[in-house]
Swiss-Prot record:
<dbReference type="Pfam" id="PF04997">
    <property type="entry name" value="RNA_pol_Rpb1_1"/>
</dbReference>
<dbReference type="InterPro" id="IPR034678">
    <property type="entry name" value="RNApol_RpoC1"/>
</dbReference>
<dbReference type="Pfam" id="PF00623">
    <property type="entry name" value="RNA_pol_Rpb1_2"/>
</dbReference>
<dbReference type="InterPro" id="IPR007066">
    <property type="entry name" value="RNA_pol_Rpb1_3"/>
</dbReference>
<dbReference type="InterPro" id="IPR007080">
    <property type="entry name" value="RNA_pol_Rpb1_1"/>
</dbReference>
<dbReference type="GO" id="GO:0009507">
    <property type="term" value="C:chloroplast"/>
</dbReference>
<feature type="binding site">
    <location>
        <position position="88"/>
    </location>
    <ligand>
        <name>Zn(2+)</name>
    </ligand>
</feature>
<dbReference type="GO" id="GO:0000287">
    <property type="term" value="F:magnesium ion binding"/>
</dbReference>
<dbReference type="GO" id="GO:0008270">
    <property type="term" value="F:zinc ion binding"/>
</dbReference>
<keyword id="KW-0240">DNA-directed RNA polymerase</keyword>
<feature type="binding site">
    <location>
        <position position="85"/>
    </location>
    <ligand>
        <name>Zn(2+)</name>
    </ligand>
</feature>
<feature type="binding site">
    <location>
        <position position="476"/>
    </location>
    <ligand>
        <name>Mg(2+)</name>
    </ligand>
</feature>
<feature type="binding site">
    <location>
        <position position="474"/>
    </location>
    <ligand>
        <name>Mg(2+)</name>
    </ligand>
</feature>
<keyword id="KW-0150">Chloroplast</keyword>
<feature type="binding site">
    <location>
        <position position="472"/>
    </location>
    <ligand>
        <name>Mg(2+)</name>
    </ligand>
</feature>
<keyword id="KW-0808">Transferase</keyword>
<dbReference type="GO" id="GO:0005739">
    <property type="term" value="C:mitochondrion"/>
</dbReference>
């Protein structure tokens, strides 16, 4: 790993100037020679299988292919470390420098950066206050643009001219009687470069700030023009704040990434497989060299212009293949991967390699429903648990004196001896694990559970925590992480355990709510059969007797029965007495719709029967047991 001499607080991404890009790749050799510019499209010599000098894999620019050995073989071994071969100019050093040494291509004509030209917001168009359509006409050589109108009153600054309009104007300018002078008209990225370079950031920002103080009268619905001015003001202020020049959005130097990040490998049949980026760089160098040659021989303007357009398209495809124009495809009709394709998306450099690193003590498997689990539990497959907790198991085996060393412990683990599962059960007791389902969109996307060993290879998940994870059981996968330190375990238990996260952080509403089959089951258990209302002639002395009658099939789950109940009944909604009866012993029996109550002479309740079903008794019993 590279060690930095200087500490830093943050990384800032900003526009790079042409001199900055050159400084990334330029190095001065001890003999005073400056290397870093790639001028040849060749990669390797197919006869010697060595990189071509000044090519895309040049050892003089990027460093040696073999450790401590120069290109020509004059210097070999570590003792020549730091020596630069006077014959081939290669520095004797480690080959891993080819992973970070860069180079550059000096362009014969400037080109625009496609990200700033054709992005979601075209920053070049915004900076110049032009439409994207007009900008593309200029860049791709369809229209001319006025850079300086001179003293000709019919021309305006940044006005677009078609080819025939410019030819007519040229005829006027070339005539001897013409008194028009100072006109400057351009086309292509060179014209855009001049327009961007002409922007006086300080003055333009001050003018836009004054205009921002006088917004349109309909302030609630500002015009599109006003919004665009505000966006332009923000952009130019950012240029001022970062010290960047808008003209840097037009490239005159292309950086070349290190060769080991775009490798070329030999296959079994003698053929070579190469990274797609090499093809893009090769096209750019070929077109660039051809353009330089055409300029040198003073070729006609139309030919040079066509070559500039082709160079622009080659650079566009390197930056973002297919963003504009025809997609460059490889030998097997597959679109070549550009720099944007390598960086962006789920499989890109950021999400796949930088944010999505593999970590130890973690696993992944399909989830299945575990309705018999407690809310704070999850079912962990035995094989996975043994692999995740292996260091803990080995430590416990040695502590208990069952083995003497780690090697012996690993052997009995491989043999799946019974003692291993006993020790594993002891190890996981009280040790929470973290379950995570991607994408983790809020803090409830990762929660802690106590693991329960289960057979099979699927992780069992309590159905009530599914809404928090946005999980379902149609093939979803979840990751398991083991908190190792005592601090991490305590945090998982106190803050991240599933029962501690039953409110949604977004709304404050409960997120652990029964749904679907649970609601249907509760409804089915507590409903009654309307047809059996007239046949509710069964009386039971207590709740257990009613359940026993249900188990012996004397009553159904939904049959209405009368059960003696001594507890408090909250039935304020139905207090209307249907009938009242005076008994021989002086007691009074009052019959309500769902209760029969017997009172003594003093008005005290003697006995109470409630009308219910076996299903409701079961439901009440389950809730009561869970609360106790």
């Amino acid at each position: 790993m590279t060690k930095f001499d200087h500490h830093f607080d943050y990384v800032k991404i900003s526009l790079a100037s042409p001199s900055k890009i050159r400084s990334w790749g330029e190095r001065t050799l001890p003999n005073g020679q400056i290397v870093g510019e790639v001028t040849k499209p060749e990669t390797i010599n197919y006869r010697t299988l060595k990189p071509e000098m000044d090519g895309l894999f040049c050892e003089r620019i990027f460093g040696p292919v073999k450790d401590w050995e120069c290109h020509c073989g004059k210097y070999k071994r570590f003792r020549y470390k730091g020596v630069v071969c006077e014959r081939c100019g290669v520095e004797v050093t480690e080959s891993k420098v080819r992973r970070h040494r860069m180079a550059y291509i000096e362009l014969a004509a400037p080109v625009t950066h496609v990200w700033y030209l054709k992005g979601t917001t075209s920053y070049i168009a915004l900076a110049l206050d032009l439409t994207v359509k007009d900008l593309e006409k200029i860049v791709y050589f369809h229209s001319y643009v006025v850079i300086n109108p001179g003293n000709y009153h019919k021309l305006n600054y940044k006005q677009l001219l078609e080819g025939y309009e410019w030819r007519n104007l040229e005829e006027k300018l070339s005539s001897h009687s013409s008194n028009i002078f100072g006109i400057e008209v351009g086309i292509g990225a060179e014209a855009i470069y001049k327009l961007l370079d002409n922007i006086n950031l300080q003055n333009t920002v001050e003018i836009l700030r004054e205009e921002s103080l006088r917004p349109p009268k309909l302030f609630k619905n500002p015009s599109t023009k006003f919004n665009k001015k505000m966006k332009r003001l923000r952009l130019l202020e950012n240029f001022l704040a970062t010290g960047a020049n808008p003209s840097w959005m037009v490239l005159s130097v292309i950086p070349v990434i290190p060769p080991d990040l775009r490798p070329m490998v030999q296959l079994d049949g003698g053929r070579f497989a190469t990274a797609d980026l090499n093809e893009f760089y090769r096209r750019i160098i070929n077109r660039n060299n051809r353009l330089a040659r055409l300029k040198a021989i003073l070729a006609p303007e139309i030919i040079i212009r066509n070559e500039k357009r082709m160079l622009q398209e080659a650079v566009d495809s390197l930056m973002d293949n297919g963003r504009r124009g025809r997609t460059v495809i490889g030998a097997n009709n597959r679109p070549l991967k550009s720099l944007s394709d390598i960086i962006e998306g789920k499989q890109g450099r950021f999400r796949q390699n930088l944010l999505g690193k593999r970590v130890d003590y973690s696993g992944r498997s399909v989830i299945v429903v575990g309705p018999n689990l407690k809310l704070h539990q999850c079912g962990l497959p035995k094989e996975m648990a043994l692999e995740l907790f292996q260091p803990f198991v080995i430590h416990r085996l040695i502590l208990q004196g069952l083995v003497n060393n780690i090697k012996a412990a690993k052997k009995i683990i491989q043999r799946n001896e019974v003692v291993v599962w006993t020790v594993l059960q002891e190890v996981i007791y009280g040790h929470p694990v973290l379950l995570n389902r991607a994408p983790t969109l809020h803090r409830l996307g990762i929660q802690a559970f106590e693991p329960i060993l289960v057979e099979g290879r699927a992780i069992k998940l309590h159905p009530l925590v599914c809404p928090a994870f946005n999980a379902d059981f149609d093939g979803d996968q979840m990751a398991v992480h083991v908190p190792l330190s005592l601090e991490a375990q305590a945090e998982a238990r106190l803050l991240m355990l599933a029962p501690h996260n039953f409110l949604s952080p977004a709304t404050g509403q409960p997120i652990l709510m029964p749904s679907q089959d649970m609601v249907l089951g509760c409804y089915y258990l507590t409903t009654y059969n309307p047809a059996a209302i007239s046949d509710s002639s069964h009386y039971f002395s207590n709740l257990d007797d009613a359940l026993m009658a249900y188990q012996q099939n004397n009553i159904t789950l939904h049959s209405l029965v009368w059960v003696r109940f001594s507890g408090l009944v909250n039935d304020s909604s139905n207090q209307m007495v249907i009938s009242s009866k005076l008994n021989i012993d002086g007691t009074i029996t009052k019959i309500f719709s769902d209760r029969i109550v017997k009172y003594d002479n003093d008005g005290q309740m003697v006995v109470q029967y409630i009308r219910t079903t076996a299903g409701r008794i079961l439901f009440n019993k389950a809730i009561r047991e869970s609360l106790l």
